[in-house]
């Protein structure tokens, strides 16, 4: 009957074709941001919840980490202010931040607040920073920060315990320092700090 034209053919679904990866060419061009929930097994107080906010510069892989006890748009906005200042002290101007579609970052999938910017989005706008959202349910588009979290699990959370937010923050800062000084294959076995220093020298 379809051949006789008695039923309309269903429109073929448009196939998603991934865009080629955009390689960053200088520090601060795009920074991936995400949140890692600290494993319960690492926290001494059963009532305490801890979260690691992570920013990673796509070009240099230089990371900034911060400890929070809430995963919400207020924490995200505070983290954005801190990461911008932290990178600026190292000579990097953040132009764009890339996140997933979590409610701590955007109201994109909120039924009632879809057209209302979150505090994170409002802060990005105030700071003149572009906020890019990845394709829904596609964490690989934030692959650098996702891979860094797997390294955190292996090198940090598998062998550390935390008794308070302050204790977690102190240990996380030490872990960040080690991470930024660790050689990386994508950087030709330079650490993020060394790679950034070599770029600055070449750019002069």
Where would I find each of the regions flagged by the language model?
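Acidic/histidine-rich, metal-coordinating catalytic segments
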Residues: 90-112, 135-137, 190-192
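Short, solvent-exposed loop/turn segments at secondary-structure boundaries
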Residues: 44, 67-68, 108-113
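C-terminal domain-tail junction helix/linker
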Residues: 10, 29, 122, 127-129, ...
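Basic, flexible linker segments flanking DNA-binding modules
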Residues: 1-40, 101-103, 109-121, 196-200
């Amino acid at each position: 009957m379809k051949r006789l034209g008695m039923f309309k053919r269903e429109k073929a679904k448009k196939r998603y074709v991934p865009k080629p990866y955009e390689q960053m060419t200088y520090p601060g061009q795009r920074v991936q941001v995400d949140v890692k929930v600290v494993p319960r097994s690492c926290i001494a107080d059963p009532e305490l919840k801890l979260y690691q906010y992570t920013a990673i510069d796509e070009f240099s892989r230089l990371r900034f980490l911060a400890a929070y006890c809430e995963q919400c748009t207020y924490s995200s906005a505070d983290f954005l202010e801190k990461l911008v200042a932290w990178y600026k002290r190292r000579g990097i101007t953040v132009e764009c931040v890339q996140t997933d579609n979590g409610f701590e970052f955007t109201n994109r999938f909120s039924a009632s607040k879809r057209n209302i910017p979150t505090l994170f989005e409002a802060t990005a706008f105030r700071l003149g920073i572009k906020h890019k959202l990845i394709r829904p349910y596609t964490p690989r588009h934030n692959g650098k920060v996702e891979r860094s979290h797997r390294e955190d699990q292996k090198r940090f959370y598998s062998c550390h315990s935390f008794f308070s937010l302050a204790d977690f923050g102190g240990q996380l800062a030490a872990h960040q320092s080690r991470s930024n000084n660790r050689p990386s294959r994508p950087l030709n076995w330079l650490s993020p700090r060394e790679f950034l220093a070599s770029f600055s020298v070449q750019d002069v």
